[in-house]
């Protein structure tokens, strides 16, 4: 069993710096382990709805002027469709004679039989996150200056968003089909969770502001790259090389997409360093909430927290990863080397550049407290037929 690095028992002071329970970091779930069905699922409270359209109108011109740059520097990071992998390449071939097709399905089930239930909790959570893609395209199209104004706009920003969505669409399709064929998960509850999540939307705190939006997507793509890479590692060690290749292939896509969004923020830092570094600080003060933070299966109102706790325990995505991503972005964007900033820009720079170290110190204290408490909880996950998992 992998080491359990808990995010429990924060004081109020610690919580002002650490990711909130609605982030992708795991916090110790509280309350009864057995979740009873309720008539109307309660969506987690929204936190960032009071600010909209916060980018000054004059900065709209920045994104208009960057359309040519985005065409030359961002669109080439997409792959032509005929060079992209497709889910069918990884799955049993239904065009084969029936006996050969069923043999391939049987082999898939034999491979997945060695994977523990807790692994499926994490894999299903990742799949559901990927499957809520309509929400993410909608979110990007709320951003002023870069949205697709017509649904088929030829601007570089709109072209990127549509093609990015098309590439991402393969991820959920592939994982969902693999899970379906494995027989290890309750697809009815998985599908209900997807529908709930898309219906709930997301609340990332980007305020229709592309500065904030592209900081968010930079962090989020890096986080999904890390998560899928770790599920690949676990699948390989548990004896499913095909699933390992699937997760690794998805991780490679996320890395390429991360590079695009990181490159956009780099350009904004070049053109408007004060505005861009302030946007980074703004998003980090809010704490990056990952796309599926409003997840529910209709029964467990803390499903996202419970899923995140399992991901933390399996070291698929941890508090250390959160700090690592922040350090990576600070280095990639060379934030420590920015010069000529205003007072506000300098304060933002100091906050962001020192934040990862502060997070690590607070996490070390939380880990020490968790070791002393030595408490675990059993939680039923509907995705795996109400089996109990320690979190």
UniProtKB/Swiss-Prot annotation:
Binds 2 Fe(2+) ions per subunit. The keyword Lipid metabolism applies. SUPFAM superfamilies: Ferritin-like (SSF47240). Belongs to the fatty acid desaturase type 2 family. Homodimer. Converts stearoyl-ACP to oleoyl-ACP by introduction of a cis double bond between carbons 9 and 10 of the acyl chain. This is Stearoyl-[acyl-carrier-protein] 9-desaturase 6, chloroplastic. It comes from Arabidopsis thaliana. The lineage of its organism: Eukaryota, Viridiplantae, Streptophyta, Embryophyta, Tracheophyta.
């Amino acid at each position: 069993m992998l080491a359990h690095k808990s995010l429990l028992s924060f004081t109020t002071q610690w919580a002002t710096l650490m990711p909130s329970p609605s982030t992708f970091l795991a916090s110790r779930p509280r309350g009864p382990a057995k979740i009873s069905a309720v008539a109307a699922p309660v969506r987690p409270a929204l936190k960032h709805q009071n600010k909209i359209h916060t980018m000054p109108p004059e900065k709209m011109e920045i994104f208009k002027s960057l359309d040519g740059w985005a065409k030359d520097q961002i669109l080439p990071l997409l792959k032509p469709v005929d060079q992209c992998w497709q889910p069918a390449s990884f799955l049993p071939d239904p065009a084969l004679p029936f006996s050969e097709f069923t043999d391939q399905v049987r082999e898939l089930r034999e491979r997945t039989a060695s994977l523990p239930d807790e692994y499926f909790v994490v894999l299903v959570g990742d799949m559901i996150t990927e499957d809520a893609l309509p929400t993410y395209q909608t979110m990007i199209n709320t951003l002023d200056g870069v949205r697709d104004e017509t649904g088929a706009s030829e601007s570089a920003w709109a072209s990127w968003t549509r093609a990015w969505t098309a590439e991402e669409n393969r991820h959920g399709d592939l994982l969902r089909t693999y899970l379906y064929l494995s027989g290890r998960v309750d697809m009815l509850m998985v599908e209900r969770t997807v529908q709930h999540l898309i219906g709930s939307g997301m609340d990332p705190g980007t305020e229709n502001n592309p500065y904030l939006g592209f900081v968010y997507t930079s962090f989020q793509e890096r986080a999904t790259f890390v998560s899928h890479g770790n599920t690949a590692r676990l699948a390989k060690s548990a004896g499913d090389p095909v699933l390992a290749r699937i997760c690794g292939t998805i991780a490679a896509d996320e890395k390429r997409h991360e590079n695009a969004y990181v490159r956009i923020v780099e350009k904004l830092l070049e053109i408007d360093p004060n505005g861009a570094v302030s946007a980074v600080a703004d998003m980090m003060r809010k704490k990056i909430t990952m796309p599926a933070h409003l997840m529910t299966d209709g029964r467990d109102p803390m499903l996202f927290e419970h899923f995140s706790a399992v991901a933390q325990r399996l070291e698929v995505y941890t508090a250390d990863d959160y700090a690592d991503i922040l350090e990576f972005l600070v280095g990639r964007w060379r934030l420590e080397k920015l010069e000529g900033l205003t007072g506000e820009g300098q304060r933002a720079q100091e906050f962001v550049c020192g934040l990862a170290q502060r997070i690590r110190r607070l996490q070390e204290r939380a880990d020490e407290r968790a070791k002393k408490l030595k408490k675990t909880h059993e939680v039923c996950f509907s995705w795996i037929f109400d089996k109990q998992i320690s979190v």
